[in-house]
Amino acid sequence: QSSLYRNRIYLGKQIVNPLPANAEGRLSKIAGLTPYLTPGHSPGHVIYYHEKDKVILAGDLFTSKKGKLQKPMKMFTADMKEAIAGSAIVKNLNAVHIEVCHGDPVKNPGSQIDEYLRENNR
């Protein structure tokens, strides 16, 4: 084991654990955040919605530029079609603000999602 990583615990082959879900398979809230499965970037990618503040933490579902939603980075997205299709969930969440990992925050993302889907499903 490298001295650089001596404080890390070896996880073996199980790197991630599934999120808790109910009997119907709906993902359980975590600290007030509701997770939604949005595969495409990776098979288990999720976004989190904070309903009280109407904020989506979108991770790598999108990138953004100048307040506009953009496709995720192609070189780091396993299935672009699936990622784009999964982004339709934004229409149902009534968010006023979305944070992405790569780009600036986006205000009122629901107002952009139809155009985003139209442009990127060609």
Language model features with spans:
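Metallo-beta-lactamase
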Residues: 1-36, 78, 82-95
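Short glycine-enriched, charge-decorated loop/helix-capping segments at active-site entrances
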Residues: 69-76
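Short acidic/His/Gly/Ser-rich catalytic and metal-binding motifs that mark active-site loops
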Residues: 59, 64-68
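Active-site glycine- and acidic-residue-rich loops that bind
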Residues: 34-46
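Active-site beta-strand termini and strand-to-loop segments that position acidic
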Residues: 29, 48-52
